[in-house]
Regions:
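Soluble catalytic regions of membrane-associated enzymes that act on cell-envelope
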Residues: 190-225
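Membrane-embedded alpha-helical bundles of multi-pass enzymes
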Residues: 1-197
Length: 225
């Protein structure tokens, strides 16, 4: 929540899933599902507060219905977080490391959330990095889902390293190093891409362009009369 507008602290996203992933180490599948539902519900209520204003102001719903509508939407979206947590616990119980399972699970579920039932492609985890221009350049290759994959990979590697015992610390460090390497490669690609685009436009003469945004109230804009 803190990584998105209006807060815009994108760095928080890189550790936001560590508490949930750490808690899953001791949970069977069903309790993990419930933990994911709770975490997702809290997250989406904080992100979707504006839906209440939209359905009340433009949909003409009373506030007593506007708030439950927003909470129902948050509950639906939290199902994907719950499935993520349950899936991570399921694969962990079968010996598949969270560093391998979590990024793939999150990316697949995020794609499903963005496409099923007309889709809800807003507030995806990759969008939290909108201020990190070098990093998000990988979106021209992997889309915003690639950014989400990388964010979850780092979270999973951190959670595995923090929760590893003395015997597993070396393997967890390998996962953390691999995540750091991919992050560095993504940042390096983005830095090169930005420089390449700037070089392409450097010989082009500058031109001044004015753009005026309309300021029409939405309730008037869509009024058929």
């Amino acid at each position: 929540m803190l990584s998105f507008p209006k807060f815009g602290h994108g760095a928080v996203a890189w550790v936001a899933l560590v508490p949930l992933l750490s808690a899953l180490r001791a949970l069977p599948v069903l309790p993990a599902l419930l933990a994911g539902l709770l975490a997702g519900f809290v997250q989406h209520v904080g992100l979707l507060y504006w839906v209440t204003h939209v359905v009340v102001h433009y949909g003409r719903l009373p506030l007593a219905l506007g708030i439950p509508v927003m909470m129902l939407l948050a509950l639906y979206l939290s199902l994907y977080t719950g499935l993520f947590a349950a899936g991570a616990a399921f694969f962990r119980n079968r010996g598949i490391p969270v560093v391998a399972a979590a990024p793939l699970l999150w990316t697949v579920l995020e794609y499903a959330k963005s496409t099923l039932l007309t889709g809800f492609p807003w507030e995806n985890l990759g969008h939290s990095q909108y201020l990190n221009l070098p990093l998000i350049q990988i979106a021209d290759v992997a889309g915003s889902y690639g950014v989400s994959f990388l964010v979850v990979l780092v979270n999973a590697a951190l959670a595995a390293f923090v929760g590893a015992g003395r015997d597993g610390r070396r393997r967890a460090f390998v996962g953390l190093a691999a995540a750091g390497l991919l992050l560095a490669l993504a940042g390096g690609y983005g830095t090169w891409r930005l420089a390449d685009v700037a070089a392409r436009f450097d010989p082009v003469p500058e031109q001044t362009v004015a753009l005026i945004q309309g300021n029409i109230d939405q309730s008037i804009k869509w009024d058929p009369s």
